[in-house]
UniProtKB/Swiss-Prot annotation:
InterPro entries: AMP-dep_synth/lig_dom, ANL_N_sf, ATP-dep_AMP-bd_enzyme. It comes from Mycobacterium tuberculosis (strain ATCC 25618 / H37Rv). Pfam families: AMP-binding. This is Uncharacterized protein Rv1549.
């Protein structure tokens, strides 16, 4: 996993596969897991790391102004995954993340992976015309963004099922 420039990921197991919540929930196997078992999915590796050292710092902003422990990171990932599942996001769906560098990006990204969705970061400087191509090409079902980008997302004209703002409710549509 490559961290955004202003965040440093201190430790994350990386494996090529993804999981979905309908498969095996790694936390339910917590007591069975040994340190010699290799996780079989990226999601299982993430949850295993969170269980092994829950109070260790997982994310830290430059200067240490914001930190997130593995315990908090994993809890946020579970909430995000549940929220996305509640919106109807399933394995194979696409979730687009459009925001400035924020610590919230990481639980959103990993939470989408936990429901089997493909998540990707969208440059927040793209004009609506380019967003049209990006969202159409990806088959975006949900866009998670900051309020300041909602008008541009809507101006893309792509029929996004849900726009979720990390900093409040999306502004009402202009008539």
């Amino acid at each position: 996993m490559v961290a955004a420039p202003c965040f440093r990921v201190l430790r994350l197991w990386t494996y090529a596969h993804r999981c979905d919540l309908g498969h095996t929930d790694p936390l339910s196997r917590r007591t069975e897991m040994t340190t010699t078992e290799r996780p079989t999915t990226m999601c299982e590796a993430f949850q295993r790391t969170a269980v092994m050292d829950p109070d260790a710092v997982a994310l830290r902003t430059p200067g240490g102004n914001q930190t997130m422990t593995w315990r908090d990171y994993a809890a946020q990932v579970r909430r995000v995954a549940a929220g996305l599942a509640g919106l109807g996001v399933r394995r194979g769906d696409t979730v687009s993340l459009m925001m400035a560098n924020r610590i919230e990006f990481y639980p959103l990204d990993v939470g989408a992976q936990h429901v089997g969705a493909t998540s990707f970061s969208v440059y927040n400087t793209l004009p609506a015309e380019q967003l049209t191509y990006v969202f159409d090409n990806a088959g975006t079902k949900v866009v998670i963004c900051e309020q300041q980008y909602v008008d541009r997302v809507r101006a893309s004209g792509v029929p996004i099922e849900h726009i979720v703002c990390v900093d409040g409710a999306p502004p009402a549509r202009s008539r």
